[in-house]
Amino acid sequence: MTDTVDIPIIAKRLPVYAHPGDAGADLCAAEAVTLEPGERHTVPTGVSIALPEGYAAFVVPRSGLAMKHGLTIVNAPGTVDAGYRGEIRVTVLNTDRSMPYDIAVGDRIAQLIVMPVTRAVFVPVDTLPDSHRGTAGFGSSGYTVTQAGEHA
């Protein structure tokens, strides 16, 4: 069973989950925009929400737009805090080097994921406890997986 939370919303077009079990609800463009190659634009969605305390929403790219058209979101994920009451806007970037991309009113341009969040209490210390990974960062897990499931 999936938990639900009631979220007050002002929108001409409600975000919609495309399939049962989807994590993200589609956000649609409220304004037509043509993105030239390499151009970015902040697109209004016409959606404003009132998240309850203890929740945040995250605006993430749609995989089909990235794969088929080279469209991505510049600050993905975009964070919508519980106290924000303004319109959700999506800064979209056309990464294609030669083709412009037209966004029409009503086009699905991003997804909105609503999640409970935990607020951290940061505790200053002089040293951190050891871990298996330690300070190994970018690329430290390798690029291929062996038959046994180990990273090479």
From Swiss-Prot:
A Pfam family this protein belongs to?
A: dUTPase
Summarize where substrate binds, as residue positions: R62, S63, G64, N75, T79, V80, D81
Family that this chain belongs to? Belongs to the dUTPase family.
Concerning HAMAP family, the annotation shows: dUTPase_bact
Name the reaction it catalyses. Answer: dUTP + H2O = dUMP + diphosphate + H(+)
User: Keywords of this protein's UniProt record, alphabetized?
Assistant: Hydrolase, Magnesium, Metal-binding, Nucleotide metabolism
Requisite cofactors: Mg(2+)
Query: What name does the UniProt record give this protein?
Result: Deoxyuridine 5'-triphosphate nucleotidohydrolase
Enzyme Commission number, as recorded: 3.6.1.23
EC class of the enzyme, as a word: hydrolase
Q: Its gene?
A: dut
List the GO biological process terms: dUMP biosynthetic process; dUTP catabolic process
Q: Which PANTHER family match?
A: DEOXYURIDINE 5'-TRIPHOSPHATE NUCLEOTIDOHYDROLASE
User: What job does the chain carry out?
Assistant: This enzyme is involved in nucleotide metabolism: it produces dUMP, the immediate precursor of thymidine nucleotides and it decreases the intracellular concentration of dUTP so that uracil cannot be incorporated into DNA.
In terms of superkingdom, the source organism counts as: Bacteria
Query: What Gene Ontology terms describe what this protein does at the molecular function level?
Result: dUTP diphosphatase activity; magnesium ion binding
Which pathway is it part of? Pyrimidine metabolism; dUMP biosynthesis; dUMP from dCTP (dUTP route): step 2/2
